[in-house]
């Protein structure tokens, strides 16, 4: 769902940051 997509994006950003 949308929540899963957002969580994936946030996870990627946190991984890079």
From Swiss-Prot:
Superkingdom of the source species: Eukaryota
Keyword Ligase: no
Known tissue expression: Expressed by the skin dorsal glands.
Cellular component, GO annotation: extracellular region
Localization terms from the record: Secreted
Chain positions with Alanine amide modification: 17
Keywords: Amidation, Amphibian defense peptide, Antibiotic, Antimicrobial, Secreted
Record keyword Transmembrane present: no
GO BP annotation list: defense response to bacterium
InterPro entries, per the entry: Antimicrobial_8
Pfam family, one: Antimicrobial_8
Primary subcellular site in the record, as a coarse category: secreted
Task of the protein: Shows a medium antibacterial activity against L.mesenteriodes.
Protein name (Swiss-Prot/TrEMBL): Uperin-4.1
Source organism of the structure: Uperoleia inundata
């Amino acid at each position: 769902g949308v929540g899963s997509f957002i969580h994936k994006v946030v996870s990627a950003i946190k991984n890079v940051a």
